[in-house]
Amino acid sequence: MCIRDSEAFGTDTFDEMYQKYENAYSVPKKKISARELITDLLKERAETGRIYIMNIDHSNTHSSFLDKVNMSNLCQEITLPTDPIQHIDGEGEIALCILSAINVGVVKDEELEEICDLAVRGLEELIDYQEYPVKAAEMSTLARRSLGIGYIGLAHYLAKNRVKYSDQSAWSLVHELTEKFQYYLLKSSNKIAKEKGACDYFDRTKYAQGILPIDTYKKDVDEIVKPEYNMDWEELRANILTNGLRHSTLTAQMPSESSSVTSNATNGIEPPRDYLSVKKSKKGTLKQIVPQYSHLKSAYTLLWDMPDNTGYINVVAVMQKFFDQGISGNWSYNPENYDNNEVPVSVMARDLLNTYKYGWKTSYYQNTMDGKVEDVITDPNSAMNDYIPPLTHTDNEEDCDACAI
C-alpha cells in the first residue's frame, strides 16, 4: 500500500482500496487469524492496562469535521484533525486540548444553561489570550476554535437521583442531561458566532451543512435509550445554518482526576473506588470523601461492586451520542467476580464488541482490582470521623454560593 492510499484510512474509500490490494496477486500478504489478533490485543491490554483503542471509523462518521480525524491524544478524548509538520514553522495542524469541566453533581437544572454559556465564553477568551509557541498549533486553534467541555461529579449526580450505573433509569437520566448539555453549549457558540462571526473553518464542519450529533450517532444506542428529545433541535439547526458556530467542537470527556480533587467532586464520569480514597500526586497525598456521604452512602455505585461493565458502557454510549469529540472511557474488572479470580478473555472481547457496537470512539485505561488497599480506605465509618463535618454536604448546601461552579 502506497503512502497516498494510506491517507484514505478512516474515509469511505478505504474499504474499496483495501479490497483492491487484498485481491491483487502481485501484492505479498501474510494472514493472521482475526480471533488471534484480537485475543493478543486484549491480553496485552489486560497485562499493561494501557493498550488504548480507537475506533477510527466512528471517530470520523460521528465527527463534526469534514476533514479526516487521524488520531487521538494520550487521554483519548480529543478527536481533532491533524496534519504533519516538516519543521517548527511548518503549516500543518497541531490539535490542542482546550478543556473545561462542569460539576453536574452540584449544578441545579435551572442553572445549567447559564453555566454552559459561561464555560464556552471563558474558553473562547482563553483561545485568544494564550500564547502559541508553534505556528501550526496557533493557526489550527484560531481557525477551528475547538472546545472540549465535559463533566465532573457524574457519580454524585446519579447518587443524588438514587440511580445506579446499571439501572435503565440512570441511562435515561444521562440521556436527558447530556442532551441539554450539548444543546446549551451549541446554543452558546451559535450566539457568540452571531456576535463575533463563525470560526474561520466553520465551512469545514458538518455543522455548516446542518448535520448535528443526533444525526450521526450509532443507532444501536437506541436499544439503550429511545431517541426521544426534550430540546428544540430543529430550531437550533436552523440558527446554526443562519449564523454558524464560533467553535468547531464543544464537548469532550477528559479523565479530570486533578480538577475533581480540587472541586471535591467524584472523578469525571467514573464510579468512585470507595467512599473515602487517598489521592496521590507529586505534592503528597490527600484523603477525599465522596460528596454527601452521610445522605447518599447507599445510593453510590462503587467501582469494584459493579458485576460487569455493562452499565458503565451504556452510560458512556449515551453520552457519546451527543458529544462531538471523544470520551475517556475505561474498562474495569474485579477478578473476584470470576472463577479462579481470573477475568476471561471472552468477557473482555464482549466489552470490546459492545463499546464498538454502541458507538464508543475510544477506550482508555483497563483497570483491574489487585487487592491492594493503600489507595483506598475500606472501612470509612471509623476513618471519616474527622472528615465528615467539614466535607459532607448538608441539605441546604446546594443553596450555598461557595459550592457553585
Please state what every model-predicted region is:
Residues E22-Y25, L41-A46, N103-V106, L112, ...:
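Structural signal for hydrophobic packing residues in well-ordered secondary-structure cores
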Residues S26-H58, D399:
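Structured secondary-structure scaffolds
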Residues C116-E138, K164-S256, S328:
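Internal maturation/activation junctions in enzymes
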Residues P389-I405:
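Short acidic, low-complexity intrinsically disordered linear motifs used
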Residues Q76-T82, Q86, L123, I127-D128, ...:
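Catalytic alpha/beta core of large soluble enzyme barrels
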Residues P28-I32, L42, L66, H87-G90, ...:
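Alpha-helix capping and helix-loop boundary segments enriched in small/acidic/polar residues
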Residues M1-D5:
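Conserved small/polar residues in nucleotide/adenosyl-binding loops
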Residues R45-T141, S146, Y151-N161, A265-G268, ...:
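Function-dense linear segments that define catalytic or interfacial modules
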